[in-house]
A protein has these predicted regions:
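N-terminal Rossmann-like dinucleotide-binding module
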Residues: 1-22
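Active-site loop of classical SDR/Rossmann-like NAD(P)-dependent oxidoreductases
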Residues: 12, 246, 270-281
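C-terminal helix-rich "cap/oligomerization" subdomain common to oxidoreductases
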Residues: 20, 42-44, 80, 88, ...
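Conserved SAM-binding strand-loop segment of SAM-dependent methyltransferases
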Residues: 25-32
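Hydrophobic residues in well-ordered beta-strands that form the structural core
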Residues: 30, 68, 93-95, 219, ...
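Beta-strand-loop-alpha-helix segment that lines the small-molecule cofactor/substrate pocket
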Residues: 40-42, 48-49, 53-100, 115
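Predominantly a Rossmann-like dinucleotide-binding segment in NAD(P)-dependent oxidoreductases
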Residues: 99-199, 317
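Contiguous beta-strand/loop segments that form the cofactor/metal-binding neighborhood of enzyme cores
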Residues: 159-251, 280-292
Length: 323
């Protein structure tokens, strides 16, 4: 792709992006509606979560394919509208879950598809930080983002886990969210102090997800949590034949000749490709050649619905049951 148009509410930022990434004659806009009048093939939606659906739908309605940053949308209703428009217009809609393209994720996904883990009945999806609250942009603004670490990082962890299990049939969701440290300052945050008055999202969130086949997922996410390690990202899968743990590398637990064995695949051979580059190549071929997407919008829709259910459960104190 050649990037020939940029849009930002602040013209200076759009101009800087043009100078960094654009063609010499790229145009700059402050209103996405004007940009969509251009003869474009693709639009990248990298805006606050509250506008993902609005901009993506307008782009597809005007004949453009869309690459939308995660999370898909702020709400399930918005995400569902995006999928419906993609189906109606026939435009490609890709959601930015680039973690799927990591070497360890690709290896483990193949093992899951080959049945090496058997029936996966328990999983843990972890994306936690002790003190790494993003203090820039609108990350702390619930109206613009829809939430905090759950919708920011937990969305990656949940997407990875559902994809590995190849199970999107959710029965129920129970969740808890906390805002226990948001009113504190001088806490050693990685990116400096935040303004407690502007911290309107949760600082940690947890979910218990039960699938229709009985499988269970535990989801944990945080920006600020008094844990021992500084951060952690983990996908733990437990199956009837084997188990796997993606945390600081990949380990697979198997039984060989009656003995428990831990396998650590060598994923360092050759030059591993950047997951972002793989994502762009797959998106390009989906647009240019009609190739199949790895991240299906229908899958991202389920992720969005589960995240929304965690917030709803946390607010009502009740388990949320899916149809």
């Amino acid at each position: 792709f050649e990037i020939i148009a940029f849009c930002d509410l602040f013209e200076g930022r759009a101009q800087t992006a043009k100078e960094t990434y654009g063609t010499p004659d790229a145009r700059v806009y402050t209103d996405y509606r004007e940009l969509l009048k251009e003869d474009l093939d693709v639009v990248y939606v990298l805006t606050p979560n509250s506008t993902h659906a609005e901009v993506s739908i307008a782009a597809m309605e005007s004949g453009k394919h869309v690459m939308c940053e995660k999370p898909m949308a702020k709400t399930y209703a918005e995400a569902k509208a995006m999928v419906d428009v993609a189906h109606r217009t026939g435009k490609v809609l890709n959601i930015g879950y680039q973690c799927r393209y990591r070497a360890d994720a690709q290896y483990l996904k193949q093992a899951c598809e080959d049945g090496e883990l058997g029936d996966i009945y328990f999983a843990k999806a972890l994306a936690v930080r002790r003190r790494a609250v993003p203090t820039w942009g609108v990350f702390l603004d619930k109206d613009k983002q829809g939430g905090g670490p759950l919708i920011d990082m937990g969305t990656h962890a949940l997407d990875m886990t559902l994809w590995m299990m190849d199970n999107y049939e959710v029965e129920s969701v129970t969740g808890s969210t906390f805002q226990k440290l948001a009113d504190q300052t001088n806490t050693g945050n990685r990116w400096g102090d935040w303004d407690p008055a502007k911290f309107t999202v949760e600082d940690s969130a947890f979910g218990f997800i039960k699938m229709k086949n009985g499988a269970t997922i535990v989801l944990e996410s945080s920006w600020a949590l008094n844990m021992v390690e500084s951060e952690g990202a983990q996908t733990l899968l437990c199956g009837t034949k084997a188990g796997a743990d993606m945390k600081d590398g990949l380990r697979i637990n198997r039984v060989h000749y009656g003995r428990q064995c831990i396998e650590k695949p060598d994923l360092t051979t050759g030059m591993p490709e950047n997951p972002d580059d793989i994502e762009q190549r797959i998106f390009y071929h989906a647009v240019a050649d009609g190739a199949e997407l790895v991240v299906k919008p229908e899958q991202a829709l389920v992720v969005t619905r589960v995240l929304e259910a965690i917030y709803e459960s946390a607010g009502t104190g009740k388990t949320i049951y899916f149809d």
